[in-house]
């Protein structure tokens, strides 16, 4: 990476950190330049304005999400995707969910991007759409697909798959948000999530 490319990435990293704490509107170009250790005028040689920085951050965030999120890559009609889920057990479901949660909470880029989206979703329509897609639409689609798949295989009772998916995944979102606000409660939330998933499989186990 060239020096200019390195500085550009440093600006993006600093912007993500500041935007995730104090929001886009409250962060000035001067603060961004100071965080990187460059002059304000120098920053404009990398980005036209603050909006251009935000646009670049959103694009990078979307690319990382598409690459790493289990929800974005789900294809329940693809045998290659469903192969390792054919004999899904409560233990497997717990590990699947907790693995994704740990990634979301502890990957610095993803964690900061989520907080930035939470702050900015009420001021930026594009961010609101991204927040809805990432935290609701894709999650519900993934778990509805999982439930339908397990019902077809005779592992879960045949009920309303969308409501079953909501019962499974939406409480987990509440605990995930709790961890964002109070990181010290992650162990507590993890225990509750595990109990919740196991109870779901007990309640809906095919008779």
Predicted regions and their residues:
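Hydrophobic/aromatic residues within well-ordered alpha-helical segments
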Residues: 50, 57, 61, 65, ...
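Hydrophobic/aromatic-rich alpha-helical bundle segments in the mid-to-C-terminal region
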Residues: 129-133, 137, 147-198
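N-terminal intrinsically disordered/low-complexity leader segments
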Residues: 1-6, 76-77
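Hydrophobic alpha-helical connector segments
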Residues: 56, 69-107, 164-165
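Alpha-helix N-cap and coil->helix boundary residues
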Residues: 27-28, 109-113, 159-163, 188
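Short amphipathic alpha-helical interface segments enriched in basic and hydrophobic/aromatic residues
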Residues: 16, 20, 24, 62, ...
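Helix-turn-helix
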Residues: 10, 14, 18-60
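Amphipathic alpha-helical packing segments from all-alpha helical-bundle domains
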Residues: 105-118, 122-152
